[in-house]
Amino acid sequence: MQGTQRGGLVPGLSPLDRRTLLFCNFILAVAWGQVNFTGDQVLRVLAKNEKQLSLLRDLETQKPQKVDFWRGPARPSLPVDMRVPFSELPSVKAYLKSHGLAYSIMIKDIQVLLDEERDAMAKSRRLERSTNSFSYSSYHTLDEIYSWIDNFVAEHSNLVSKIHIGKSFENRSILVLKFSTGGPNRPAIWIDTGIHSREWITHATGIWISQKIVNAYGKDHVLKRILNTMDIFIEIVTNPDGFAFTHSMNRLWRKNKSSQPGIFCIGVDLNRNWKAGFGGNGSNKNPCSETYRGPAPESEPEVAAIVDFITGHGNFKAMISIHSYSQMVMYPYGHSLEPVPNHEELFNLAKDAVKALNKVHGIQYIFGSISTTLYSASGISVDWAYDSGIKYAFSFELRDTGQYGFLLPASQIVPTAEETWMALQTIMKHTLNHPY
């Protein structure tokens, strides 16, 4: 399946031949187990101008597809990070050299980091079993997270409940934690993590924050004020199919796992599937692209479930979607360069959130609107939230800035979560103090 993502369809094959090829690839993948990334590297390029950015974008459209952008070509001031398969390294490096594009190697061998990550998880799992505990400083599988959710809700039923909001494409439960001190249809705050399945630090951060809420309530006067007036909803695994796949087969899978008749590349980018500038810049109509938008807005059950839930609730005041990596706090719009009506308020709130975050461990984040800070992105969740009347809509990009990328070591889970919590609390406090 990684092969179809890297290479797209083979030209000149009949539909039957294509199906046969894909079936053979599937059998081989099952036989071999997880996709191996030995020798794959992450290269960083700093484009000097728009022409060089265009040359980098051309790499993604080549067949076979030669690169997987971790930080795509956006603007000359931002570095471009791309994973290059070992087999494509000579041709990609030659391409860069021929066009005067200087590069550095951020990750020399991806598989080395993956092996370290897997070993750390195995060690943590043995310790958890021997002590009958759950480690908040380790990465976990989907089954482990869902089991933790059940235990967590049972232990803290006075403050937390579990809500089933729908089913994924592969029929997995989509679960949301509700933190509430009671009262019907109160003003609410939405937080989601893991919409892109390979961003494991976000799931781990969502788990840690959930535990922080129950531990701090009653001790933290700011949190107590928030929960005495508002409810907090956290969706820890927004893309359960993709997340399960990152553990079973392809650690670097980004999209969900939906398929369509007659289309042989799998998955939709769930953060391009919302009804907010759908199909515009920063999304892709090619099903083999990592930013494939899907056939229609809200076509994906994982997106539709959130839309139906938030719309049905009708009283959400803030929506925060947590991603990695790049160390940013951003607000709408992604699909337009036009500033939103309360741009100044969101700018100042993002600034305050970044200040609060920085005080914890000294980590520097940047902030601003999505389209001016990161890149143009259409059909994204926070744009939909803002257009739906949710005034305080933010997107976070957590650690780091590229040393590890999506493969952030587990040793950074707790510090990342601690600083993220302070930024979140800043936004929640502002939302509480500025009702609308």
From Swiss-Prot:
It comes from the Eukaryota. Its cofactor is Zn(2+). SMART domains: Zn_pept (SM00631). Binds 1 zinc ion per subunit. Residues 1-33 form the signal peptide. It is found in: Secreted. Residues 138-431 form the Peptidase M14 domain. InterPro entries: CPA_M14_CPD, M14A-like_propep, M14A_act_pep, Peptidase_M14. Disulfide bonds join 265-288. Keywords: Carboxypeptidase, Cleavage on pair of basic residues, Disulfide bond, Hydrolase, Metal-binding, Metalloprotease, Protease, Secreted, Signal, Zinc, Zymogen. GO terms for biological process: proteolysis. Its EC number is 3.4.17.-. Residues 34-126 form a propeptide. Substrate binds at residues 196-199, 254, 271-272, 324-325, 375. GO terms for molecular function: metallocarboxypeptidase activity; peptidase activity; zinc ion binding. Gene3D superfamilies: Metallocarboxypeptidase-like (3.30.70.340), Zn peptidases (3.40.630.10). Detected in testis germ cells. Zn(2+) binds at residues 196, 199, 323. The active site is at residue 397. Belongs to the peptidase M14 family. This is Carboxypeptidase A5.
